[in-house]
């Protein structure tokens, strides 16, 4: 049921998981292996000094996908809440496919621009002396012309290098999408509890966070990535056992 919810709806929250450090490994290994990145596995979502990512602060985060500057961004993300007794810090989720479907039906010209315009995503990582760059459209389709990916993160948008004649059209469409992705009609707001595993399709569901007061208590999540192939492979196997 967990994998079905992830595959068909893009989001699922597991309740009452153990809250021991790194215990997410014991749960996720029942699906498959996790995907390693320069953030390490698990990555610690906690307020730390000298962070190399805004997630490692107490600041609010705009709705985004993770690692848009990778050629293939992680397919799924799992955020395991170990403790959350700080004031604020509510989580936000948005079904990006629902938003771009709304955009397509109500603002077709903007949709077309975002489908066809390549965008520069950049990550400058001082901790590994690396600059990661990727050019991809914000919206991509699969071989059936169904939505395959939404690639969106304000924090990692690079300077646009498209033709000047395209610039105004692109930014007009981009602002429209940005507004919709933070429209309360499409947002789900919730507070993570210790033992929750917030699981979602990282290339469909955008996530964000409200600001929290790091002096009021602790908020510690551990994050894991997994490729789409692993989720689909395990789901195919299970469904074949129970046709």
Segments from the language model and where they lie:
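Active-site environment of non-heme Fe oxygenases that use a 2-His-1-carboxylate facial triad
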Residues: 1-243
């Amino acid at each position: 049921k967990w994998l079905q919810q992830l595959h068909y709806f893009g989001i699922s929250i597991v309740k009452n998981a153990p809250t021991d450090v790194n215990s997410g490994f014991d749960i996720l290994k029942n699906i498959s292996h996790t995907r390693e990145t320069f953030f390490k596995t698990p990555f610690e979502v906690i307020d730390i000094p000298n962070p190399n990512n805004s997630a490692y602060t107490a600041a609010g985060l705009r709705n985004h996908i993770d690692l848009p500057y990778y050629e293939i961004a992680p397919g799924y993300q799992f955020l395991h809440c170990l403790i959350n007794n700080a004031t604020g810090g509510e989580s936000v989720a948005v079904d990006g496919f629902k938003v771009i479907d709304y955009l397509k039906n109500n603002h077709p010209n903007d949709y077309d621009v975002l489908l066809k315009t390549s965008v520069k995503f950049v990550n400058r990582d001082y901790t590994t002396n690396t600059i990661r760059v990727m050019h991809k459209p914000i919206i991509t389709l699969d071989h059936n012309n169904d939505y395959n990916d939404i690639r969106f993160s304000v924090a990692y948008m690079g300077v646009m290098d498209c033709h000047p004649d395209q610039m105004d059209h692109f930014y007009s469409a981009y602002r429209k999408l940005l507004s919709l992705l933070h429209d309360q009609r499409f947002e789900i707001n919730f507070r993570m509890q210790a033992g929750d595993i917030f699981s979602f399709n990282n290339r469909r569901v955008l996530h964000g966070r409200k600001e929290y007061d790091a002096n009021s208590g602790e908020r510690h999540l551990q994050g894991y990535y997994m490729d789409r192939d692993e989720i689909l492979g395990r789901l195919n196997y299970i469904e074949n056992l129970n046709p």
